[in-house]
Amino acid sequence: MPIAGRTHGQHAVPATFGYKPAVWIDEMIRHVERFRQLAPRLFVAMLGGGAGTFASLGGQGPRVQAGMGTILNMLPMTVPARTIGDHLAENICLLGLLAATCGKIAREIYTLMKTEYGEVEEPVPAGTVGSSTMPQKRNPKLCQDIIAASAEVRAAVPLALEAMQTEHEADRTTSLVMETAEARACIATGDMLARLVEVLRGLRLDPVRMRKNLDLGGGLIMAEAVMLDLGATIGRQHAHDVVYDAAQAAFVEGRPFAALLAEDPRITTHLNPPAIEKLLDPTAYTGLCAEIARDAAVRARATAAEIAQESIAD
């Protein structure tokens, strides 16, 4: 499904819609790996007494702590100090990374759902009221919820780092901060993920609008392809200058890019009209988008299957 690839908010080169989820999947798989690595550090048993010194338990302290850990299926802390909070902060930092990806996904869908784009739409059930005064509104409510929740999770990251600044052997002040940060981050993450699942399951794509937007520039999105093909004959830098002139004229004068290319003897000496027309076909210049998307889908299914098995084992 061809779509305009955009960089810095402008048309760049053609891509496929499937390339976008491939990017999201790639990040998500790394998040899964990070949380797997975090688990044994995060879920630990702490029973070292009031100051973490085992003073009240004596020599049996480590064994008692280990026993409690066994019951809870947790590893015992090597140093059961109440001032240690890096593992808790790490959890929030990783939730922040996950939230950043989720927020990015929602923001992309939010943008592509704008009237001026119209390339995708989050699920909008029949009867949904977008506005009490504007009946035509089909607002991206779910994506807005995700973006807001993502911001809340990320905002908890500096709180968690601040909570690591504990004085002496314990301080309720930082404990309160950490508890607040963990609660906010975990609750908002759950809310965010639930809505993201709903969006992705019901996401509607509009290939006709994607193609219409792809053609908005009248072939300008294929300037790189023309430059590279021409560059094989006259040199890349010279080809860049030649195609640049045509592209800028198309912008400034509002003339068709194809016509400007066909009028330039620096181009027509090496490329005939059929060759130029072929080079301006955006569907022929999506690189390895399809392969990347298919590979990402395979890896996503494999990772999902692994997570399902791990859940059963737990």
Feature names for model-found ranges:
Residues 1-7, 76-77:
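Short, flexible active-site-proximal loops enriched in glycine and acidic residues
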Residues 132-314:
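Catalytic-core signal marking the mid-to-C-terminal active-site face
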